Design a protein with these regions (language model features):
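Conserved glycine-rich Rossmann-like NAD(P)H-binding loop of the short-chain dehydrogenase/reductase
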Residues: 20-36
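Conserved glycine-rich cofactor-binding loop
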Residues: 6-7
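Residue(s) in the substrate-gating loop at a strand-loop-helix junction
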Residues: 134
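Active-site helix of classical SDR
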Residues: 109, 150
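Substrate-binding pocket helix/loop in short-chain dehydrogenase/reductase
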Residues: 85-86, 90-98
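SDR active-site lid
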Residues: 164-225
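Conserved NAD(P)H cofactor-binding loop of Rossmann-fold oxidoreductase domains
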Residues: 77-82
Length: 259
């Protein structure tokens, strides 16, 4: 079950899962995009249309997904981004972004666990719950304060659940892409990445890395270099990352003014 499948990363993950023999349920709010994705996918695929921010839709989606047999993989890929100076961020945007990126995935994960525990077969097959986060769930970055807060929260939530459920058949994992070429990005973000020389991945490359991650025993995965290094350094010597970002701050703020 892949949420946010009408988006770039979610759609690419759904597609590669289908190519690897999974029966995939694709969730989203855009019927047209989901229909186009289904046509492009190989293997079995079913559309689950609904808004995860609505409790009735979440319940209906899970009932349909579990109708015939238990679901052994949930990928929460639905999300929003925001590149805005914090003082210019409207309260409505903060609420919407935190709801979509953190609170709704928490609620849907809770409901998925309950459904999985009820419907799980006698073999107790391993279940994977993967939250699609971001490298900005490890590194606070100017202009993305609200987005970073949501992804930091999602990572902490995943880490806590992984430990809480370590004696069960459910594994909780966090997958963190870096900058990726998708429609979620504002034009100013794309232009800033070019100006700073930041690497930007295709959704296909991200999906391939996701598949490798899924087939591994890793609990967390940061996509790309030097982001992996920056994450490690930020954990031990954050001042070095402070200095690196400080040297780029004038450029970042120039593009913030355009957002």
């Amino acid at each position: 079950l892949v949420t946010g499948a009408s988006g770039g990363i979610g759609g690419a993950i759904a597609k590669i899962l289908g190519e690897n023999g999974y029966h995939v349920f694709i969730q989203g709010r855009n019927q047209k995009k989901l229909a186009q994705l289904k046509i492009s996918m190989s293997g079995n695929c079913e559309i689950l249309l609904g808004d995860l921010n609505k409790s009735d839709d979440r319940a209906n989606i899970l009932n349909l997904a579990f109708a015939n047999k238990p679901v052994d993989l949930l990928v929460n890929a639905a999300g929003l981004s925001s590149f805005v100076a914090f003082e210019d961020t409207k309260p409505e945007m903060i609420n919407e972004l935190m709801q979509t990126n953190l609170i709704t995935p928490m609620l849907f994960t809770q409901e998925f666990i309950a459904k999985s525990n009820t419907e799980q077969n006698a073999e107790q097959k391993q279940v994977n719950v993967v939250q699609v986060g971001s490298a900005f769930g490890y590194i606070g970055y100017p202009g993305f304060s609200t987005y970073c807060a949501s992804k930091f929260g999602l990572r902490g939530f995943t880490e806590a659940l992984a430990r809480e459920y370590s004696d069960t058949n459910i594994r909780f994992r966090y997958f963190a892409p870096r900058a990726t070429s998708t429609s979620i990005n504002a034009v100013s973000v794309d232009e800033m990445n070019k100006a700073l020389g930041n690497a930007v991945d295709t959704v296909e490359a991200v999906a391939k890395t996701f598949m490798d991650f899924l087939n591994s025993k890793k609990r967390q995965q940061v996509v790309g270099w030097p982001e992996k290094l920056f994450v490690r350094i930020n954990g031990f010597i954050p001042k070095l990352v402070d200095n690196a970002i400080q040297s780029k701050l004038a450029v970042i703020k120039r593009y913030l003014q355009q957002s």
